[in-house]
Regions:
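Short, Asp-centered acidic motifs that coordinate Mg2+ and/or phosphate
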Residues: 17, 150-151, 169
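Post-DEXD/H (motif II) to motif III coupling segment of the RecA-like Helicase ATP-binding lobe
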Residues: 2-60
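Short amphipathic alpha-helical segments and helix-helix/interface helices
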Residues: 6-11, 96, 121, 141
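TOPRIM-like Mg2+-dependent DNA-processing core and adjacent phosphate-binding/basic surface
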Residues: 164-170
């Protein structure tokens, strides 16, 4: 709602009351939602969602895929894209190996670039790459949801507002 596209809609229609719902209140661009909404009237946290069955429990494993971010600069609170891609060069084999050893069921993998996504997907049988340029995204999600695709490797697509209940491993 804090994005310019939404703000233009709000400005155009000038609603008397504006109510917002979000599962991702902490935006990547650091724009605060209180610039759009004056107060929070109801909220639940991650723990509440898990305890009440709205979200699945979390099981985390740290996997060493052989990267070094010590020389990667940050820009506006995120890693510099070109530098991050360079730092992640050569990690596709380790990511595919971690997938084979640890993934349970439908898997969603996040890559740092389109090239990185393609390199990872090449190493995972049946994996499909989804990027901002993917034309048949809805068909891919439908096939993934139906169990026809075991793994989606994406680059900057499934970051906010994604709801694919079949995903078991990220």
């Amino acid at each position: 709602a804090a994005a310019n596209t939404y703000r233009k809609i709000f400005d155009h229609f000038t609603p008397d009351k504006l109510i917002g719902f979000t599962a991702t209140p902490n935006r990547g661009d650091k724009v605060r939602l209180d610039t759009v909404f004056s107060k929070i009237i109801f909220q639940r946290d991650l723990r509440w969602g898990i305890e009440h069955g709205y979200l699945c429990d979390i099981f985390c494993r740290r996997v060493n895929i052989g990267y070094d971010l010590s020389h990667v600069r940050t820009q506006r609170g995120d890693y510099a894209p070109g530098e991050l891609e360079e730092a992640m060069e050569g990690t596709a084999d380790a990511i595919a190996q971690a997938y084979r050893e640890l993934a349970t069921g439908a898997t969603l993998i996040f890559a740092v670039s389109v090239h990185h996504a393609e390199e990872i997907a090449k190493r995972i049988p049946g994996a499909v790459v989804v990027t901002g340029e993917t034309k048949d995204r809805a068909a891919i999600i439908k096939a993934f949801t139906a169990g026809e695709i075991p793994c989606i490797v994406n680059c900057m697509v499934f970051t906010e507002g994604t709801d694919i209940p079949r995903v078991e491993t990220v």
